[in-house]
Amino acid sequence: FLSFFQNGQEDALKRARAYVVAGADGIMIHSRNKSPQEILSFCDAFRKTNKQTPIVVVPTSFNEITEGELAKHGVNIVIYANQLLRAAFPAMENVAKDILIHHRAKEVDDRLLSIKKILNLIDTI
């Protein structure tokens, strides 16, 4: 895992190359910036000397970029680390509030996945 928070791109590239030499299966790079520019710059620079090692990104902050755009810069894997969890919290909060208001769960039934569907999902995994 590499981050620009420490010492910038040159340091990140140096560490990435060292990780590859040490046997890393891939390089994960992350940034808190809203712009993907430093990630793209890193990927372009890394790909100049290493075309094989997979690059993994987690576009939580720089979420406007598409997977296709990332791929053009040599990214192999995109991880949406917390978007599903963050989407689930408002729904869980609303259901919890309604249960507290009504002192039962009947009023939230239409917002729940059935147990049968959950079990079917588990069976298919």
Regions found by a protein language model. Give the residues of each.
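Alpha/beta enzyme core
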Residues: F1-Y80, A87-K97
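Extended, intrinsically disordered, low-complexity segments
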Residues: Q83-I125
